[in-house]
A protein has these predicted regions:
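Histidine-acidic metal/acid-base catalytic patches
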Residues: 33-52, 58-154
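Active-site acidic/histidine proton-transfer and metal-coordination neighborhood
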Residues: 2-50, 138
Length: 154
């Protein structure tokens, strides 16, 4: 019945011009690679898409680059968020959310993420997400904007 619910919601959303998009996220029912694989195998790609979040993908022990390639044409939305995997090794529970960083100040290989997005022909939205910035919202947004412009050339 779960597949039927997702496909039914996705079909209804599509009729209304909206894309049903699952965002694998820490602390939710769709987070681990096995959850994503199950959802991909048991839902209709015409109706169920994905939002990949680079940091949450990393928290789940996956490579954002490999997940982008796996999801391929089902990728409808993209969250760019950095994470410090060194701090993540000692973080427990909700403290894992405190390991997020401004773009370029964590350990995610964003040039490789950009290359994977280009490889699958993704031309959708890239949303920079800053959860619990270390210094402050404005500073973290500015640092991330500079990184996107100067390093990723976006």
């Amino acid at each position: 019945y779960k597949r039927q619910i997702a496909d039914t919601l996705g079909a209804y959303a599509k009729e209304k011009g909206v894309t049903l998009c699952f965002h694998p996220h820490y602390g939710t029912c769709v987070f681990w690679e096995s959850d994503i694989d199950y959802l991909m195998a048991h839902t209709d790609p015409r109706y169920v898409s994905f939002c990949i979040d680079t940091a949450h993908t990393t928290l789940a022990g996956m490579s954002p680059v490999e997940l982008i390639k796996k999801v391929g044409p089902r990728l409808a939305y993209m969250h760019l968020k950095d994470v410090d995997t060194y701090a993540l090794k000692t973080a427990e529970g909700a403290d894992k959310m405190g390991t997020f960083r401004a773009l370029g100040h964590g350990t995610i290989d964003f040039p490789a993420v950009k290359a994977a997005l280009e490889e699958i022909g993704y031309d959708g939205i890239l949303c920079v997400e800053l959860d619990r910035p270390e210094v402050g919202n404005f500073h973290s947004a500015e640092v991330s904007r500079i990184y996107i412009r100067d390093v990723l050339d976006i």
